[in-house]
């Protein structure tokens, strides 16, 4: 049996190849890409040098074998590229902030000839290259390679550069990791260096220098922490995405080590794509005795790519900015954006508008005395089964850059807020954020809200108004940020809405929680011949063609929606003084209507006034306007009325009023309230829209009562003048 020939690798030649690539690779404009990066490193502008395999692939002088060796033995080649960078590192061309301790120590070491100590032969006295370097080398995987799932990473990938996708479930604190330990001998005074390549190491106690050996002295070594080199270190748990888990299995997770500039780049709940080196991690101590030859594995991260950027991280490119400018000039953009949300779901136009405003939100306000007023909108969708509440929730989480979806029965109080757990690395008690904390600066969707235990539901009260989670457990007393918009879906108390009972009995939520929702949307499933026929056609079309029917325009894709919303969220509109009285009057009229009603449809408090302001500001943001217009306030009031539209229609049926008579009553009451004989058409349309009537019904009412000489209609503006108010 012939022995297989093994090819010896000349690492000096490999370093020459790496040096040639770094020195000669040109960017898209012909500029020396990596030499420019090294100049920024020398000027202390950046620390990370990221070498992309895509560039190595396109470099004319790099062969495929070299590329394969870099991919399969990445840890070794990081050192080779670092040595090549040491040789190519240019002198600094700009003044930079001096790191006093480090620079003084380095200057002193060079002046004293620390490179070699007493006779230059002792390896422990030679200054390691790591302690000289003020840069970090990362090798980024191919951009077009399909990422593996955690389940697909096998033992054959050990030592290789792999790309993995998953969701971050846990992040440890950032801690210092020793890279080079520096000791000083009490006898000879020399510096002794010890490179640390693992998580644990055995410190040196006796001086190994030649002078101490010649003097037969056992010099005592003192660890110099200020002179040693530390690296930022963070441990992260990456879990399989739900769509990658086979049937009947639980998601697997992988430990990821982040070092240096890659720390603090992810947070729990982020869906990311990581490229890194898959490495074994041997057990230590008693665990090693029991484990035998078995080792744990981890991923040493080289690059991190977020699937969905946060709104504030969006940097609009030229073509995206032009597209947003074109959309902003469209007079019907509000309707188009709303209809682009879940176009496969039939109808629910006003619900989609409310959900669009939830995504946009209003800016948080902080008063001079430190009090905060939230800007996030909270919406509860309550309705009969089968009206697509859960599908709307899932779609909003898909569109939002940061979103967490959970269900009422599957969530406990600590699962929503925060739990105290023991850190496996440090054995300390640490806080682990729940769904509401994970959704900080995003959206938390809670399905089956009515099925939650009352004790668990009360945990949400503080989050919805103060937007913090206060904890006092296991000796930890703190507050966590939970600046999240809550989107809840619930069924009425008896499964379906019972018209024989009052709204309060059907809704079955405590007033303390009810008042915290900006909009409580009641969606009732009523039999209607025309609507049911249209819906059935729509559902059959979606089922057959896997897409929504034509909407009259091309729906905007989620990335475009995110870009538009991120641009809108940068606007901070203000409410002009002339609208203050108008908003106050509208709020007081809502309170009066509720006081007159025997069974009020909602629970109106001063929070309702803040809700009107938040919705109005979100509408102004969509128009990229710096000030709130009256039309924004009118639309906010209309959405509040339309959320209870199905109940108003039943009230009208019970009272025996038809649409025409009810519209006449609304206009007559308005004329009496303002003590005026005239009502503008635009104002009349706004009034009846709030009650759920259409413009066609208003025109029919105007014509009918004009023929009875109750009022006169202006031929051009359609303004109303009462003949006898």
Curated annotation (Swiss-Prot):
Its EC number is 3.6.4.12. It catalyses: ATP + H2O = ADP + phosphate + H(+). It is an enzyme of class 3 (hydrolase). It comes from the Eukaryota. ATP binds at residues 383-390. The keyword Repeat does not apply. A motif (Arginine finger) lies at residues 515-518. GO terms for molecular function: ATP binding; ATP hydrolysis activity; single-stranded DNA binding; single-stranded DNA helicase activity. Residues 333-538 form the MCM domain. Keywords: ATP-binding, Cell cycle, DNA replication, DNA-binding, Helicase, Hydrolase, Nucleotide-binding, Nucleus. It is found in: Nucleus. One of its GO terms (cellular component) is MCM complex. One of its GO terms (biological process) is DNA replication initiation. Belongs to the MCM family. Probable component of the MCM2-7 complex (MCM complex) that may function as a DNA helicase and which is essential to undergo a single round of replication initiation and elongation per cell cycle in eukaryotic cells. Component of the minichromosome maintenance (MCM) complex, a heterotetramer composed of MCM2, MCM3, MCM4, MCM5, MCM6 and MCM7. This is DNA replication licensing factor MCM7. It comes from Oryza sativa subsp. indica.
């Amino acid at each position: 049996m012939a022995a297989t020939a093994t090819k010896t690798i000349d690492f000096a030649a490999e370093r020459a190849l790496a040096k040639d690539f770094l020195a000669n690779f040109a960017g898209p404009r012909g500029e020396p890409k990596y030499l420019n990066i090294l100049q920024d490193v020398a000027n202390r502008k950046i620390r990370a040098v990221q070498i992309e395999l895509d560039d190595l692939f396109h470099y004319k002088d790099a062969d495929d074998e070299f590329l394969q060796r870099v991919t399969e033995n990445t840890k070794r080649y990081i050192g080779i590229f670092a040595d090549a960078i040491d040789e190519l590192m240019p002198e600094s061309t700009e003044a930079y902030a001096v790191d006093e301790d480090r620079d003084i120590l380095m200057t002193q070491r060079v002046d004293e000839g620390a490179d070699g100590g007493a006779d230059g032969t002792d390896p422990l006295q030679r200054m390691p290259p790591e302690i000289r370097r003020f840069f970090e080398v990362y090798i980024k995987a191919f951009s077009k390679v399909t990422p593996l799932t955690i389940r697909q990473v096998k033992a054959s990938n050990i030592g290789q550069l792999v790309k993995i996708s998953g969701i971050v479930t846990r992040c440890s604190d950032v801690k210092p990791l020793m890279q080079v330990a520096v000791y000083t001998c009490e006898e000879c005074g020399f510096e002794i260096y010890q490179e640390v390549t693992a998580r644990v190491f055995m410190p040196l106690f006796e001086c190994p220098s030649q002078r101490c050996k010649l003097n037969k002295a056992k010099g005592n070594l003192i660890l110099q922490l200020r002179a040693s080199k530390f690296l930022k270190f963070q441990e992260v748990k990456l879990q399989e995405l739900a769509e990658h888990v086979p049937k009947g299995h639980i998601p697997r997770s992988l430990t990821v080590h982040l070092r240096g500039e890659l720390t603090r780049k992810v947070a729990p709940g982020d869906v990311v794509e990581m490229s890194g080196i898959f490495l074994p991690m041997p057990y230590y101590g008693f665990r090693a005795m029991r484990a035998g030859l078995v080792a744990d594995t981890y991923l040493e991260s080289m690059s991190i790519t977020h699937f969905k950027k946060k709104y504030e991280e969006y940097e609009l490119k030229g073509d995206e900015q032009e597209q947003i400018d074109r959309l902003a000039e469209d007079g019907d953009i509000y309707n188009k954006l709303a209809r682009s949300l879940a176009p496969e779901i039939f109808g629910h136009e006003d619900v989609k508008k409310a959900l669009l405003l939830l995504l946009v939100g209003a800016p948080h306000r902080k008063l001079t005395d430190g009090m905060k007023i939230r800007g996030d909108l909270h919406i509860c969708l309550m309705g009969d089964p089968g009206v697509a509440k859960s599908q709307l929730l899932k779609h909003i989480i898909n569109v939002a850059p940061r979103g967490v979806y959970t269900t009422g029965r599957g969530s406990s109080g600590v699962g929503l807020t925060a739990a105290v757990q023991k850190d496996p690395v440090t054995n300390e008690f640490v806080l682990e954020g729940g769904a509401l904390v994970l959704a900080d600066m995003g959206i938390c969707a809670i399905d089956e809200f009515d099925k939650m235990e009352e004790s668990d539901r009360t945990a949400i009260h503080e989050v919805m108004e103060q937007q913090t989670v206060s904890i006092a457990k296991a000796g930890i007393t703190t507050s966590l940020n939970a600046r999240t918009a809550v989107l809840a879906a619930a069924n009425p108390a008896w499964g379906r809405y019972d018209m024989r009972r009052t709204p309060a009995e059907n809704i079955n939520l405590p007033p303390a929680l009810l008042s915290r929702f900006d909009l409580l949307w009641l969606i009732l499933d009523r039999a209607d011949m025309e609507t049911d026929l249209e819906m059935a056609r729509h559902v059959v079309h979606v089922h057959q063609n896997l897409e929504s029917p034509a909407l009259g325009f091309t729906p905007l894709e989620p990335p475009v929606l995110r870009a538009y919303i991120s641009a809108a969220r940068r606007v901070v509109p203000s409410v002009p003084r002339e609208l203050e009285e108008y908003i106050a009057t509208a709020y007081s009229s809502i309170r009066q209507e509720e006081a007159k009603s025997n069974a009020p449809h909602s629970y109106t408090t001063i929070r309702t006034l803040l809700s009107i302001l938040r919705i109005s500001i979100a509408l102004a943001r969509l128009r990229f306007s710096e000030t709130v217009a009256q039309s924004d306030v009118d639309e906010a009031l209309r959405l509040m009325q339309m959320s209870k539209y199905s109940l108003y229609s039943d009230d009208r049926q019970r009272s025996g009023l038809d649409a025409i008579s009810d519209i006449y009553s609304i206009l007559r009451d308005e004329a009496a309230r303002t003590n005026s004989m005239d009502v503008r058409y635009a104002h009349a349309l706004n009034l009846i829209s709030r009650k759920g009537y259409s413009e066609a019904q208003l025109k029919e009412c105007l014509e009918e009562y004009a023929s009875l000489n109750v009022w006169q209609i202006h031929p051009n503006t359609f303004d109303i003048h009462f003949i006898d108010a």
